[in-house]
Amino acid sequence: MSIPKAYLEHVAIWVKDIHWHIRFFREVFGMEMREVQGTAEEPLQYWTLGGMQFMSKPDFEGPEGRLGHLGVMCEDLDAALAAARRFEVEQMPQGFNWLSLPDGLAVEFIQACPASAVRELLAVNARAPE
């Protein structure tokens, strides 16, 4: 008997400033909106194509109880890092491709090989009705 395969569809995180996170993940990783609870102007929760779910919690303090880090596969590592550095982020001791966001979330940027794999994977929408 073979083991059924699965994959992680999304990661949900509490964020203090949901608009900042939406803008960062859109401008750095090209992650567009898949769904929103509330409105785009005043979202309570926001899901991206690419697996992120941001849950607005303006009084959220620090990374405790959130998660270790996000590993994000990039078509163009250098371009993604350049875009990220336009935001208030800090390089981490783990390496040039590890950045800490202002609220403490750690993000590891990874170069996809081949780069085209990112677009191929993002072209699949398993939630789309048949």
Q: What label would you give each PLM region?
A:
Residues 1-4, 7-17, 34-35, 45-46, 59-130, ...:
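Vicinal oxygen chelate
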Residues 2-6, 12-53, 79:
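Core segments of cupin and vicinal oxygen chelate
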Residues 31-66, 99-114:
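Conserved short beta-strand elements that form part of the metal-binding/catalytic scaffold
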